[in-house]
């Protein structure tokens, strides 16, 4: 007996085997629809939204590092 999963896009049962070229999707079309949803941010992984603050956007340089940069 082979394992069957539902296509995440359309719900069609898909056999989970090396012969199923697009698993877990039933077709290349469903795979591309899913990829497009991730790309357009219609799908996302739940979690806190991260916005870099000005403190983390630039690395803090020591006085010694700044002096070395000024020498060049």
Swiss-Prot record:
Binds 1 zinc ion. Zn(2+) binds at residues 7, 10, 26, 30. The keyword Metal-binding applies. InterPro entries: DNA_gyrase_inhibitor_YacG, Znf_NHR/GATA. Residues 44-72 are annotated as: Disordered. The keyword Metal-binding applies. GO terms for molecular function: DNA topoisomerase type II (double strand cut, ATP-hydrolyzing) inhibitor activity; zinc ion binding. Keywords: Metal-binding, Zinc. GO terms for biological process: regulation of DNA-templated transcription. It holds the Pfam family YacG. It comes from the Bacteria. Its cofactor is Zn(2+). Signal peptide: none annotated. Interacts with GyrB. Belongs to the DNA gyrase inhibitor YacG family. HAMAP family: DNA_gyrase_inhibitor_YacG. Inhibits all the catalytic activities of DNA gyrase by preventing its interaction with DNA. Acts by binding directly to the C-terminal domain of GyrB, which probably disrupts DNA binding by the gyrase. This is DNA gyrase inhibitor YacG. It comes from Tolumonas auensis (strain DSM 9187 / NBRC 110442 / TA 4). The lineage of its organism: Bacteria, Pseudomonadati, Pseudomonadota, Gammaproteobacteria, Aeromonadales.
